[in-house]
Every structure is written in C-alpha cells, then in structure tokens.
C-alpha cells in the first residue's frame, strides 16, 4: 500500500515539516510506503497533487495543514470515480474538521497515530455548483453579508464565528452587517425574505465552536441549514451570544434551523451574493448544494467521534465568556441569564 502526505510547509510555523520524519514512521509502521509533497503558493497546488496521486493509485492521501489544505485535497479526490482513503493531520488555526472528528489538534504525530486503530468511516461531502463551477466542501458553506465580511480579515480569522469575536472588538465594522434578500429552497420548504446570512453545515464545529449545529452528523446524508433572519444589530449580537452560550439559538424565532439533503440559494433579484465554502470565497449565487452521502472514506477513531454535542466545548469557554461579556456591555442586556450585566473592561480594571 502507498500513502502520499500532502502538507503545507508554512502551516503552524512549519510544524509539519519539523515532524515529517516521525509522521512517515507512523504510516510506514502501519504498512504504507510513504512519500510527501510540499504545497506551493501556486493556486490549487494541494488539489492538483491530490488528484494526481489518486489517479496513479495511491491508497491513502494524508492532508496535513489547515482547513484550507484539507479542503483542497478533498476537491482533488471528490470528483473521481475511484477515491483513495483520506487522513488528516491538523496544523492550522481553527481545524474545524479535526475538531469534529476528535483528532488530536495539538500533536501532529498523535494525529497520525489515529491510523493505528484501524478504524474509518465514509463521510458526507458537500457539492456546490455555481454557473459552470463545481466545488466540494467538508465543513461549511454559506452566503450573505456576514459571510462576505470574512474576506476582509486575516486568514486566521476567516471562519464566520471566529470573525464575529474579532469584529465585536472593532465596533466600527458592526454597522456593515445588513440583511439582503434571499430565496432558499430546501427539502421541506422555501425561505423567501431578508436574512443576514445562511449556513450549510456538514459538521458541528464552525470556527472552533461546537454549538452552532450541535446535532450535525458526519454521515447521515443531511446538511444542517441555518438561516439568520435578524436584521437588528442588538438582536444579532444576542443571537450570537446564545450560540456561544450552549446552543440556545435553536429555538430563536429569528433562526430557520432544519435538515436537508439539497439546497438552492439565490438572490431574488439581480443583486450579487458571494458564496463561502470552508471559509474561502467559492463563487457567486445562484448555487445548488447537494449532500454526497458517505462519499469519501476517512481514517478516524470512530470510538471517539462525538456524534452529537451535549455540552459546551471546554477549549472555547474562555473565548465564549469574553464574547458574552462584550455583548452584555454593548447591549446592556443579561445574555447568559445569571442576573448580572458583565463588563469585560470593568473586570480587567479590577484585576
């Protein structure tokens, strides 16, 4: 058997490159003749190599890098009739898919060692068709003014909710959040109206938080569709705080939350709506999203995968608490229901 490690040499201060010998050893001991390819700044470098490696018969492709590298590798193999197994070694900032799979995110060698358990499953892949362009994603798609703002920030903050925490600190950007007209068709109905954004989720982890689509499954053939209908700034911040405070947004009347296998989204007029795929610009609507059920086999410890999140992500608690305090201060509202309106500035001063 042969394995091809496709890695981003610049991810995490070149951490993959520094651990490459040990990573090779893990896969060699698992029975794979292993080689590597370092991605280049050229567009679609990882995608092209993944497609090439699959076509010449590699049995396993290892995507080592951030979510962008993993997305490229998936795009390289998802359209093929014969697809190799996929493994991921997270070396980026958010590492959403590794988080959803419960793959170690702070130790690359331990992430590689997941293969030693000899476990895998077939994961769903999202297909997005825009005009004549076909793309794939494995975590999140979306559109609307809020997702478009993510293109203006540094790459490490490009995830939607990571960016929210960023621009609440920079209040000058908040007035830019405005609803736009949307027409969204899904399995059980049609949404027609103004919305700040819509999200098409395959996993429960978005921007490092696991409560946005808490009941998302990785292999059920369904997207989680989330449409944020609110256009009021205070309501919007309250809604985000609910997301971060234990997934309390699911019953919010300003949210459409449903499961669907296919989505068609477009602006009802000639206006432009950019589409975000796994945190990057993917093209312009109209777009058709299709869930490709159990499309790619991925190496993962199936014993450890938490199919539905029933508690807050402990790793994000500090960020969530700080965000909620910021929102409470800006809106003068008790967001978390503890009977107090907190101020992060006040607490910083006291400390």
Q: Which stretches of residues belong to each language-model region?
A:
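Catalytic core of DAGKc-family lipid kinases
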Residues: 30, 37, 79-196, 200
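Gly/Ser/Thr-rich active-site loops/lids in small-molecule metabolic enzymes
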Residues: 157-165, 214-235
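ATP/nucleoside-binding phosphotransfer catalytic cores, i.e., glycine-rich phosphate-binding loops
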Residues: 186-187, 192, 217, 227-315
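Glycine-rich beta-strand-to-loop/alpha-helix junction loops that act as flexible
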Residues: 9, 64-66, 89-91
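Calcium-binding acidic motifs and repeat modules
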Residues: 314-351
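Short Gly/Thr/Asp-enriched flexible loops that form oxyanion-binding sites at enzyme active sites
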Residues: 68-84
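ATP/NTP phosphate-donor binding region
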Residues: 1-61
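Glycine-rich phosphate/pyrophosphate-binding beta-alpha loops
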Residues: 142, 146, 199-212, 281
């Amino acid at each position: 058997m042969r394995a091809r490690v496709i890695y981003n040499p610049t991810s995490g201060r070149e951490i993959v490159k520094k651990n490459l010998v040990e990573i090779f050893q893990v896969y060699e001991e698992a029975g794979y003749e292993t080689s590597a390819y370092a991605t280049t700044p050229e567009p679609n470098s990882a995608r092209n190599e993944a497609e090439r490696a699959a076509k010449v018969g590699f049995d396993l492709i290892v995507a080592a890098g951030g979510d962008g590298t993993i997305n490229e590798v998936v795009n390289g193999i998802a359209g093929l009739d014969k697809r190799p197994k996929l493994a991921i070694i997270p070396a980026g900032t958010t590492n959403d898919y590794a988080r959803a799979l419960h793959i170690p995110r702070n130790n690359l060698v331990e992430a590689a060692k997941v293969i030693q358990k000899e476990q895998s499953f077939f994961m769903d892949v999202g297909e997005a068709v825009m005009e004549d362009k076909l793309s794939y994603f494995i975590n999140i798609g979306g559109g609307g003014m809020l997702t478009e703002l993510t293109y203006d920030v540094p790459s490490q903050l490009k995830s939607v909710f990571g960016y929210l925490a960023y621009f609440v600190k920079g209040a000058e950007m908040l007035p830019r959040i405005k609803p736009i007209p949307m027409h969204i068709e899904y399995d059980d109905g049609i949404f027609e109206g103004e919305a700040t954004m819509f999200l098409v989720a395959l996993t429960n982890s978005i921007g490092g938080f696991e409560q946005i689509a808490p009941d998302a499954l990785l292999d059920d053939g369904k997207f989680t569709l989330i449409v944020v209908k609110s256009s009021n700034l205070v309501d919007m911040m309250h809604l985000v705080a609910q997301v971060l405070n234990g997934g309390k947004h699911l019953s919010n009347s300003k949210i459409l939350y449903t499961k669907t296998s296919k989505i068609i989204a477009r602006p009802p007029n000639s206006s432009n709506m950019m589409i975000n795929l796994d945190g990057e610009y993917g093209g312009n609507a109209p777009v058709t999203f299709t869930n490709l059920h159990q499309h790619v086999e991925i190496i993962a410890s199936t014993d450890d995968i938490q199919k539905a999140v029933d508690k807050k992500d402990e790793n994000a608690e500090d960020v969530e608490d700080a965000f909620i305090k910021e929102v409470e201060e800006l809106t003068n509202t008790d967001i978390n229901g503890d009977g107090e309106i907190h101020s992060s500035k006040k607490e910083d001063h006291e400390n």
